[in-house]
Amino acid sequence: MLFATLGSINDGNIKILEDESIKITEDLTIIGRKDKTERNRKNSRELIEQADQNTYLILTDHQPVELIENSRLGYDLQLSGHTHNGQIFPFNLIMKFFNLSEFIYGNKKIGKFNIIVSSGFSGWGYPIRTAGNSEYVVINLKKENTK
């Protein structure tokens, strides 16, 4: 499944952002991070300094980490996954009880900073899911009227 997905990404000419940003419109920039297990992963400050900070800044990070820091730096929205919303019972309870992630699932706001952590549309490791539903997240961004 993973290799089929990676093949589809390559065949579809989809750009994976790894510690880089792309300005989509004059008002929107998306910044993608390398996985936190990568040794040469840039920090959030380096990435935001390289981006146009006069745009709405969306940070994509597989793991929902450094949320307080990202809110202080001025990111507008962080999109993450990784937790699969506790894909397999009882790991969903263990994750919550031992606070194994800064944020496990859903939408959270820190000041003006929004975080969305999705359970994803697939699983990890085992082709089963006994906790947390699969999902696609649809986000509608609307430009504020600044008149």
Annotate each predicted stretch with a short phrase.
Residues 1-147:
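Soluble catalytic domains of enzymes that build or remodel membrane lipids, polysaccharides, and related
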